[in-house]
Amino acid sequence: MARFFRRRKFCRFTAEGVQEIDYKDVATLKNYITEAGKIVPSRITGTSAKYQRQLARAIKRARYLALLPYTDKHQ
């Protein structure tokens, strides 16, 4: 019987020693939003609570400044 090995999630920002998540770094922020434009929860990404709050704030600022879309579901 095959057992599935689930890889341990870790916070990328803690591992890299990031002080503050920058709202102008759109390439990084795009990794943490879905195709529909929603913010991916930390239980999926493994981001720590401190950086999840910074991430949410940075994504919301980038949306407000039109660096990121609020949604991609325009028809």
Curated annotation (Swiss-Prot):
Matches recorded under Pfam families: Ribosomal_S18
The role this protein plays is: Binds as a heterodimer with protein bS6 to the central domain of the 16S rRNA, where it helps stabilize the platform of the 30S subunit.
Q: NCBIfam families, per this entry?
A: S18 (TIGR00165)
Name of the protein in question: Small ribosomal subunit protein bS18
Which controlled-vocabulary keywords does the entry list? Ribonucleoprotein, Ribosomal protein, RNA-binding, rRNA-binding
From the UniProt record, give one GO term of the biological process aspect.
translation
Q: How does it assemble?
A: Part of the 30S ribosomal subunit. Forms a tight heterodimer with protein bS6.
Q: Does the keyword rRNA-binding apply?
A: yes
* One GO CC term, this protein: cytosolic small ribosomal subunit
Per the record, the similarity remark reads: Belongs to the bacterial ribosomal protein bS18 family.
Gene Ontology MF, one: structural constituent of ribosome
InterPro entries reported for this sequence: Ribosomal_bS18, Ribosomal_bS18_CS, Ribosomal_bS18_sf
- The leader peptide range reads none
